[in-house]
Every structure is written in structure tokens, then in C-alpha cells.
């Protein structure tokens, strides 16, 4: 009896593979690629918070938060990392607000970046689907879900009501996209805004536009919020930003990465490296002074950051120790053009 059942199952499996191709059905233990393949996020602190060393390939990621919190910056750093590793990136700019000069400063190769500025939400999502289905693009960023306006809304009058139209559009698109994203191992990052429900007395009134579909389909959801302003003297030079992993299907969620987002420069690698090195006792902090081995590297956090920026060899050494302490892969070597760069001035305390 058992042999008959096994023979029937084998026949069914062969029939399925013949109809839908090899790999369409298999035993879970036989799956070839069980190890999660990732790309770095561009932030060491965020790589640690994500739990797997970066963004998992073939998954959907949602990045949301208030205005000017650093959502697009987070996505552009991911694009820069993909390009550094020889991959192809696409940016669907539904907001029509991408600054190419800022993207370039973050390390994005704008000559190779595929850019689309769609007229309607349907057009933007169809372009995303075509790019993902090609299998030739490693990362697609949609900025933003809230700006994906359905065609009916654009063609209609200004005061017309279109209840649930955008939510239906996103639900339909994600049903179609999720399979091809997984099959082609493309990373899809959807940037989203936040809105507030009217009349909520208890609990969090904040919601994200585009319905619930994206929340369900996303493997990772990142909440990006400004914590405080960073100043040099009286000048505001950036923001201390908290990135909270509110959903994570590949590692434990609710971890927080704190980074410095500097105006015009993006995430400060020196700042996060310094904080992580202090946490793991690689760099010693005594009062206001920071020391590495026998050398004092700065009085105050800003001066220690500047010292690290001016000494890339030491920074690479600290980076290797921090990565080993957190169990993250090796960092790339320091570029030659950074070794001879002009030193930054220290900050007056």
C-alpha cells in the first residue's frame, strides 16, 4: 500500500515538473539556495539591526516615516551598494523629486541608474513589473507609494471621490509582482509616507497610504524617524535618525539602528562605526575623549568622527574589528582616492 502511494506521488511530481518546469515543486530540505542571499544596506548599524547582514534578495521591503526623515536616503544607499557590487539598479520616481547631485554624493552612479518618472500609478507599477520580470535588475526602488496616483483620479475632476482606488491598485500589483520578485531575486523597496486617521482617541493614529497589501507582502518594514538635530556650533548639519525594524520575516524584529544623516552627504559611516566600536570596547570612551589603542582620536564625538574620516587606514582597521565582533562580512578595501584626500578641520568644543 505504501509503495503504491509513493509511486502515485512520484508520478504526480513528475507531471507537475513536466507542466511547470523543474523546481516548481520540491521537498523543503532539497531546496538548493537555503542560505539567505543579501546585499549591504549601506549602513553597518542597519545591517546589524536587519539580522542577516543586509537586505534579503527576492523580497519586498517597505521604508516609511514622516517627511524629510531620510527614507529616500536609506534607499539610495542601498542602490549605491548594489552598483558597487556590479549590479543594476532602477529608481521609479513617482514623486518627481529625485536630486541627482545628492544621489551622486551618496555613491550612486547616476550614469548607470535606470530612472522612470511615470505619469500614473498604473504606469509606474507596470514599469516596475517589466524590470523585475526581465531578471536583469538587482534592485527596484519606488518613491513613493503615496505618489502612485491611479489613472482614474488623474483623469477625474479635482473634487471627485475615489475611495479605495489606490489600495486596490497596490493589492493587484503586489499579487502580480511578489512571485516574479522572488523568482528573479530582485530587491523591491517601496518608500511610503504616513497619514493620520481622524478621530482616533486611543492608540497610534498613524497609518501608511496604499491599503494593507504592502504590509502583508513586505518581508521587512523599516520605520525612519528623526530623533534630534546635529549641530556644529550654531549650524544644523544633520539629524540623528532612528531606523526601527518593525517587521522582519528573516530575523528577529524590533531592533533599532541609530545613524547620523548629514545634510548633503547621507549616512555618516564614521559616526555609526564610532558608536558600534565604543559599544564593543574596540574604541575607549573616557569622559569626552575617544581613544583607539594608545592614541587619542578626539575630544567629543564630532572630532572623533573627523579624525576617523582623515585616517582611512585606521577606519578600515576599526571597521574590520567591528564587523568581526558583530559577525558581519568583510568590508571592501579603502579606495585609493580617499587615502590622499584633504583633511577635515576639527570642531571647536
From Swiss-Prot:
GO-annotated molecular function: ATP binding; ATP hydrolysis activity; ATP-dependent DNA damage sensor activity; damaged DNA binding; single-stranded DNA binding
Superkingdom: Bacteria
Compartments where found: Cytoplasm
GO terms classed as biological process: DNA recombination; DNA repair; SOS response
Residues annotated as transmembrane: none
Binding-site residues, ATP: 65-72
InterPro entries from the UniProt entry: AAA+_ATPase (IPR003593), DNA_recomb/repair_RecA (IPR013765), DNA_recomb/repair_RecA_CS (IPR020584), P-loop_NTPase (IPR027417), RecA-like_C (IPR049261), RecA-like_N (IPR049428), RecA_ATP-bd (IPR020588), RecA_C_sf (IPR023400)
GO cellular component: a single term: cytosol
Keywords noted in UniProt: ATP-binding, Cytoplasm, DNA damage, DNA recombination, DNA repair, DNA-binding, Nucleotide-binding, SOS response
Family, similarity comment: Belongs to the RecA family.
Known role: Can catalyze the hydrolysis of ATP in the presence of single-stranded DNA, the ATP-dependent uptake of single-stranded DNA by duplex DNA, and the ATP-dependent hybridization of homologous single-stranded DNAs. It interacts with LexA causing its activation and leading to its autocatalytic cleavage.
Listed HAMAP family: RecA
The protein, known as: Protein RecA
Species: Enterococcus faecium
Gene that encodes it: recA
Amino acid at each position: 500500500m505504501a509503495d503504491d502511494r509513493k509511486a502515485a506521488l512520484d508520478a504526480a511530481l513528475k507531471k507537475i515538473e513536466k507542466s511547470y518546469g523543474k523546481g516548481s515543486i520540491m521537498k523543503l530540505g532539497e531546496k538548493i539556495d537555503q542560505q539567505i542571499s543579501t546585499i549591504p544596506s549601506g549602513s553597518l548599524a542597519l545591517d546589524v539591526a536587519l539580522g542577516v547582514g543586509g537586505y534579503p534578495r527576492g523580497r519586498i521591503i517597505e521604508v516609511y516615516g514622516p517627511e524629510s526623515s531620510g527614507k529616500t536616503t536609506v534607499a539610495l544607499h542601498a542602490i549605491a551598494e548594489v552598483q558597487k557590487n556590479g549590479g543594476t539598479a532602477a529608481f521609479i520616481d513617482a514623486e518627481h523629486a529625485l536630486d541627482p547631485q545628492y544621489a551622486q554624493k551618496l555613491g550612486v552612479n547616476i550614469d548607470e541608474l535606470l530612472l522612470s518618472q511615470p505619469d500614473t500609478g498604473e504606469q509606474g507599477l507596470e514599469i516596475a513589473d517589466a524590470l523585475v520580470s526581465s531578471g536583469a535588475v538587482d534592485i527596484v526602488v519606488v518613491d513613493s507609494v503615496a505618489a502612485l496616483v491611479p489613472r482614474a483620479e488623474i483623469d477625474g475632476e479635482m473634487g471627485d471621490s475615489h475611495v479605495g482606488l489606490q489600495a486596490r491598485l497596490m493589492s493587484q500589483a503586489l499579487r502580480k509582482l511578489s512571485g516574479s520578485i522572488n523568482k528573479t531575486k530582485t530587491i523591491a523597496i517601496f518608500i511610503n509616507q504616513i497619514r493620520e486617521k481622524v478621530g482616533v482617541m486611543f492608540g497610534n493614529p498613524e497609518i501608511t497610504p496604499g491599503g494593507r497589501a504592502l504590509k502583508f507582502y513586505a518581508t521587512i518594514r523599516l520605520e525612519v524617524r528623526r530623533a534630534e538635530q546635529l549641530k556644529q556650533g550654531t549650524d544644523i548639519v544633520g539629524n540623528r535618525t532612528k531606523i526601527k525594524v518593525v517587521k522582519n520575516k528573516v530575523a528577529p524584529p524590533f531592533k533599532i539602528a541609530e545613524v547620523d544623516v548629514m545634510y548633503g552627504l547621507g549616512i555618516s559611516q564614521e559616526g555609526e562605526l564610532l558608536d558600534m566600536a565604543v559599544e564593543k570596547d574596540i574604541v575607549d570612551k573616557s569622559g569626552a575623549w575617544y581613544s583607539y589603542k594608545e592614541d587619542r582620536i578626539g575630544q567629543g564625538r564630532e572630532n572623533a568622527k573627523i579624525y576617523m574620516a582623515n585616517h582611512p587606514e585606521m577606519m578600515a582597521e576599526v571597521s574590520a574589528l567591528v564587523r568581526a565582533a558583530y559577525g558581519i562580512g568583510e568590508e571592501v578595501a579603502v579606495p585609493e582616492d580617499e587615502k590622499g584626500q584633504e583633511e577635515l578641520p576639527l570642531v571647536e568644543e
